[in-house]
Structures are given as structure tokens and as C-alpha cells.
């Protein structure tokens, strides 16, 4: 048996297109397309590439983007002032502050100033509270993308055994809560978990999200399981030539693909879904602000 590859790029393209369709409907009532504002502080190369991809996909879907760049020397007060200005701007529906921020800026304080109704990354305390309480709200993009891919692969997730490796507020914890919303049985594993390989072998759905290259080995995955690899790691690839690198996930793809039921590749799996869910959240935020909740359900 060879695993089915879950094509995150193709599914993300469907969501982008749907976001564009709904955004076009909203434009007539808003007088403009839904708008995403992205704040980038400093010159981190990976963040720069990611922001450019976000802006490109946003505009390709027919939505509007605003990109605000500040130097790494910008003060915390300056960044908070930008966030508050965007909060007050009726022409902005979603706000995203690209992380990581420079070390002298308190990320929690900056994120905490984002209007929860414009929090398209789903990271404010209000957004987290809505998720924990099961109330409607904007959900964190990467975890939401994981759940959507799992549903595309397996259908109804009710009763499925899910093991999430990692307990970060960005992926691990919200992913666990989102799978619980789908009536799955969820276990969160972490660095203190005893006998992690045995625990992983119980999973119908395995979600490694720790940033450790190929940590999950082939014999950690039971036959037929669905592996949603959130990790994206750059490692040396001497076979490609001196100084060359390649991207790998947190799961050892070549060891797993032969007996898993479903698996996301890296790249091309979870990554594209993160931006797709960001566009979806931007449109949802715009629909709710326009008092058209029916358009927020897609």
C-alpha cells in the first residue's frame, strides 16, 4: 500500500477561488473588496518571502492588501500605534502582524492590541477564548487548514483518534481544540511525553508540529493513518551539490509513504493551506463587519 498524497496546493487554490467569489459579492455592499493589512517589522528573509506570498495570493483572489513595513529598529509603541490605526480604519477587514518580531518588542502586547474582529490569525486572547468556549470566531490558520485537509481525506472525523505532537499556541493547542470540535478523540504529545512512538502508533490522524526535521519515523505510524505534517525545516542536501539544501517536514516522508493511508508532502501540503485560511478569515471578517453572516459560511 502506498499513501495518498494530500495536495494542499490544489485544495488551497479552491479556497482562494471561493474567497474571491465571496469577496466579489461583498464588494457591492462594502463599496470595495475585503482588505487584509500585513505588518512586517525587520528584514527576516523567510518572513519577507512569506509576506510577499500572502500579498500575491490575496491580490490574485481579487481581494485588497495593504503592506506596512518598518525597520527592525522600530519601537514597540510605533508598532502598537500602527495596529491601533488599522483597528480604526473602516477600510481594513483583517490585520496580520508577521512574526517573529524583533527581540525588543513584546509580541503578546502587540498581538493583544489587534481588534479581535479583525484578528485573521486567530491569536488574540479573545479569539483563543472563543475557540476554547466553542463560540464563533476567527480560527488560527494553520490548525484550521489541518482540520480541513483531514476532512477532505477522511470525511467525518467523529471518533477518530488524533495525536498532535506539539503544544504551541500557534498550532498544537488550537489544532487539538479544532479536532475536538469535530468530535475526534485528541491527545497532545510534547517533550515530556513518555514513549512517544507507541502513542503515535495509536493515531488515526497524526499531526507533527514541533520543527524537528524528520523526527517522526516510519515505525511510529500505523498502517492506513493520515499524517498531516506541519513542520517545514531546511536541511543540508550534499547530494544536490556543495552548499545545497532541501525542505523536509517533521515526518520522515520516505519511511512513511509506503504504509500510511494519507500524507501531506513538504513543501506543498500544509503550507499553502495556511495562506488559504488567511484569505478565508479575511472574507469572513469582512462579511461579519458588513452584517452579512450568510456569506461568512464557506
UniProtKB/Swiss-Prot annotation:
<feature type="binding site">
    <location>
        <begin position="166"/>
        <end position="168"/>
    </location>
    <ligand>
        <name>NADP(+)</name>
    </ligand>
</feature>
<dbReference type="InterPro" id="IPR020630">
    <property type="entry name" value="THF_DH/CycHdrlase_cat_dom"/>
</dbReference>
<dbReference type="GO" id="GO:0009086">
    <property type="term" value="P:methionine biosynthetic process"/>
</dbReference>
<dbReference type="InterPro" id="IPR020631">
    <property type="entry name" value="THF_DH/CycHdrlase_NAD-bd_dom"/>
</dbReference>
<dbReference type="InterPro" id="IPR046346">
    <property type="entry name" value="Aminoacid_DH-like_N_sf"/>
</dbReference>
<keyword id="KW-0486">Methionine biosynthesis</keyword>
<dbReference type="GO" id="GO:0004488">
    <property type="term" value="F:methylenetetrahydrofolate dehydrogenase (NADP+) activity"/>
</dbReference>
<keyword id="KW-0368">Histidine biosynthesis</keyword>
<protein>
    <recommendedName>
        <fullName>Bifunctional protein FolD</fullName>
        <ecNumber>1.5.1.5</ecNumber>
        <ecNumber>3.5.4.9</ecNumber>
    </recommendedName>
</protein>
<dbReference type="GO" id="GO:0000105">
    <property type="term" value="P:L-histidine biosynthetic process"/>
</dbReference>
<dbReference type="GO" id="GO:0005829">
    <property type="term" value="C:cytosol"/>
</dbReference>
<keyword id="KW-0560">Oxidoreductase</keyword>
<dbReference type="GO" id="GO:0006164">
    <property type="term" value="P:purine nucleotide biosynthetic process"/>
</dbReference>
<keyword id="KW-0378">Hydrolase</keyword>
<feature type="binding site">
    <location>
        <position position="191"/>
    </location>
    <ligand>
        <name>NADP(+)</name>
    </ligand>
</feature>
<dbReference type="GO" id="GO:0004477">
    <property type="term" value="F:methenyltetrahydrofolate cyclohydrolase activity"/>
</dbReference>
<dbReference type="Pfam" id="PF02882">
    <property type="entry name" value="THF_DHG_CYH_C"/>
</dbReference>
<dbReference type="InterPro" id="IPR020867">
    <property type="entry name" value="THF_DH/CycHdrlase_CS"/>
</dbReference>
<dbReference type="InterPro" id="IPR036291">
    <property type="entry name" value="NAD(P)-bd_dom_sf"/>
</dbReference>
<keyword id="KW-0521">NADP</keyword>
<comment type="pathway">
    <text>One-carbon metabolism; tetrahydrofolate interconversion.</text>
</comment>
<feature type="binding site">
    <location>
        <position position="232"/>
    </location>
    <ligand>
        <name>NADP(+)</name>
    </ligand>
</feature>
<keyword id="KW-0554">One-carbon metabolism</keyword>
<comment type="function">
    <text>Catalyzes the oxidation of 5,10-methylenetetrahydrofolate to 5,10-methenyltetrahydrofolate and then the hydrolysis of 5,10-methenyltetrahydrofolate to 10-formyltetrahydrofolate.</text>
</comment>
<dbReference type="InterPro" id="IPR000672">
    <property type="entry name" value="THF_DH/CycHdrlase"/>
</dbReference>
<keyword id="KW-0511">Multifunctional enzyme</keyword>
<keyword id="KW-0658">Purine biosynthesis</keyword>
<dbReference type="Pfam" id="PF00763">
    <property type="entry name" value="THF_DHG_CYH"/>
</dbReference>
<keyword id="KW-0028">Amino-acid biosynthesis</keyword>
<dbReference type="GO" id="GO:0035999">
    <property type="term" value="P:tetrahydrofolate interconversion"/>
</dbReference>
<comment type="subunit">
    <text>Homodimer.</text>
</comment>
<comment type="similarity">
    <text>Belongs to the tetrahydrofolate dehydrogenase/cyclohydrolase family.</text>
</comment>
